[in-house]
């Protein structure tokens, strides 16, 4: 997450970008992430327009963005931005210990990790929208 003007200044020095988009819906994104997604989407679009190599990732999170409707909405957004590739990151519990070490409550405690085989139908929606989608 970075202001667009700073992103424009910085991108001339960057060849490869990893970026995550956690939700297509601005209100849901802001509620969970703490910021809306307008700036993130604007920066992603700008980077693609500059022909930068980008790995756009969706962390697929249970009860947040894991429904087939969510996949449809992401795919529609990506089609509108001419984005033709996305990596799915199935939810895992790797961060749980970090929260404990920081003395913070882990909101996802007890939530089952996802695996690629859990997301084949989700992945297929992107493929049906001509978006190369992989894990």
Show where each model-derived region lies.
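Conserved AdoMet/S-adenosylmethionine-binding subsite of the radical SAM
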Residues: 1-94
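Auxiliary Fe-S-binding modules of radical SAM enzymes
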Residues: 60-135
């Amino acid at each position: 997450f970075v202001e667009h003007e700073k992103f424009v200044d910085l991108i001339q020095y960057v060849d490869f970008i990893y970026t995550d988009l956690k939700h297509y819906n601005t209100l849901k994104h802001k509620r969970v992430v703490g910021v809306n997604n307008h700036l993130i989407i604007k920066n992603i679009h700008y980077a693609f327009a500059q022909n930068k190599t980008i790995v756009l990732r969706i962390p697929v999170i249970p009860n947040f963005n894991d429904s087939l409707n969510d996949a449809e909405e992401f795919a529609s957004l990506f089609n509108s931005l001419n984005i033709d590739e996305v990596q799915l990151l199935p939810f895992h519990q790797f961060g749980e210990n970090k929260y404990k070490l920081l003395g913070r409550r882990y909101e996802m405690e007890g939530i089952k990790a996802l695996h690629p085989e859990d997301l084949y139908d989700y992945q297929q929606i992107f493929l049906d929208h001509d978006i190369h989608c992989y894990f």
